[in-house]
């Protein structure tokens, strides 16, 4: 028995030693990251007391914590998200790699309660999730006053507060010294814009104040349920509308795989950048304060609803910011626009809890929206010749018209599948499944589309001050104008603008000798004679004569669209596909054009090498670090660079040689006029007299192919019919037809070139409509576009060349 007892004692002692060793090993070895992440739960039940003690970074009304109504706001979050039960009663834990005791992060956790090790762990955890792009996260920042930072777009060192879904910072937001995401350039940020906005960068140029007679008529029409107020009217007061106002900017951007982004949008900016850019333009209006919430969301591998819930969870921490706010501005890009509208509806629905009233302005800026989905277009020679030859051989035995029609449908479906496969090349299956749902917005009866329709309809009908501004590119390789501007969504409070890039209108800023400034002084008509002392310059650049037709045509179409003349929607749908080309994206250039561009660029670089290296004009980081942040940086210019031509060449040469040091911004997201236009569309327009619901058009006009003969005949008849409707329009704004782009060069800072104008003249006759048709005929005679689609459109519209003068054209369309 003694022997047996001794063996049992030894076994017990051995087991005790092993358990002790395991505990010691667990204390010494830090936990693995994946296991750590799995311990976090999706929390939806934040309380009103959940606020970090962040010192000077966080702003609270009257210097106090959140107000009591916020508790109701949290309760509404819980009920809306259907997350009740045991999860609301369990705290969230994270095991520190520095401590054996766990970090408890729950609704009652204060930032001031955390020690250095815990803070470091939570910060590293948040940054790790951000780098993986697997969860939604929000960056809060109080924008400094314009007098303290004139060039705020160049500063990423402004402190803010980070909150990442699925981490401890989702419960206890963390103050950081600088923005944790991608962005920021240690060198120079040079903004070069040669662009034009249609119909105008200011609604004052195509809208007017509602006359008393019109107001009475609209009231009577509304009483009898007749159509009325087809468009917005201007306010009487148009000055200091944002001065001393409290403003919140909410930017929402969805991540995209790099290759997908390049093939579709060419590029997009971060939510942080969009918030900064809009706040920079707001600074000119002298608001009392500007607060920003920048949401970066994993919409590339996560569906809309889960992402929406994550954003709502993060919004709970900032409920106190909305108290007595005067304006809330939203910004969304492409597939984040639906999420932006859902968040806007959620915030507005809770306005009483958030303590802002119905007078608060709510407005959404949409870049390249996906609300109308997309389909693929390709007008390249190799695609059309090979595919249609194969189609002809396969259907040659089928003489029946219905069989031919089926073959065309089969070809269209197959071609769409081929292009979609190219778009999704290089991304995983989950991302493909998620991103492929974007095209479902094309069907107005799809679940994706209905969800957005309901949110947008609620905002348009229930919130008088709500505005929606769609911005899209005229020249694109992916989506048509109708798709980007959601042309089938009709409501007076929806405004649409087109952004035209001079790069795709035959204007080459590298070869500045061919530029033609639009000045009244003949002495400065040559760009070599325009001298600059600083890297800030603004002028107008003449549009080449052989491309004026495109601008003239779309200018009047955008005017009619924003004035509520929906009878022109069919022709917009028919014309839009012709402005699609692979050449309108640097990442989708056809091989022959890419090779041609590379050869010409190589020659240009050799010329610039000999020009600038010989003279010793080189930039370095030491020089940049020696300058004050946000300065105009005159040292960017070598001493003997004194003209616009030399500056353009020098900056673009430096950008080619060291793009990480000299970075050029020239896309739609970088144009200050876009943001000013959005603000003017919002604050200068008057609320309609009566509420209206969103109306949807059923698109039966967009062709399946621009090369289809039936569609070509249809376009000829539709354009003729549109001309006959155009010359009947009365009270069109009498203003100059655009013939010049805005050329702007700046180093981070905003060039405020706003000039006070008397606005256009409105007369109740057809004089302006006739003048517009005359200009369409005149500019067509010189039209010589470069791309296959536009050349094809020119051939289809060759009927315009049959008329000897515009009077004959006018007389002809009058007879129809």
From Swiss-Prot:
<dbReference type="GO" id="GO:0098853">
    <property type="term" value="C:endoplasmic reticulum-vacuole membrane contact site"/>
</dbReference>
<feature type="modified residue" description="Phosphoserine">
    <location>
        <position position="79"/>
    </location>
</feature>
<keyword id="KW-0597">Phosphoprotein</keyword>
<dbReference type="GO" id="GO:0000329">
    <property type="term" value="C:fungal-type vacuole membrane"/>
</dbReference>
<feature type="modified residue" description="Phosphoserine">
    <location>
        <position position="76"/>
    </location>
</feature>
<feature type="compositionally biased region" description="Low complexity">
    <location>
        <begin position="28"/>
        <end position="44"/>
    </location>
</feature>
<feature type="compositionally biased region" description="Polar residues">
    <location>
        <begin position="64"/>
        <end position="81"/>
    </location>
</feature>
<dbReference type="GO" id="GO:0006665">
    <property type="term" value="P:sphingolipid metabolic process"/>
</dbReference>
<feature type="compositionally biased region" description="Low complexity">
    <location>
        <begin position="391"/>
        <end position="400"/>
    </location>
</feature>
<dbReference type="GO" id="GO:1990816">
    <property type="term" value="C:vacuole-mitochondrion membrane contact site"/>
</dbReference>
<dbReference type="GO" id="GO:0005778">
    <property type="term" value="C:peroxisomal membrane"/>
</dbReference>
<feature type="region of interest" description="Disordered">
    <location>
        <begin position="1"/>
        <end position="81"/>
    </location>
</feature>
<feature type="region of interest" description="Disordered">
    <location>
        <begin position="391"/>
        <end position="411"/>
    </location>
</feature>
<protein>
    <recommendedName>
        <fullName>Uncharacterized protein YMR160W</fullName>
    </recommendedName>
</protein>
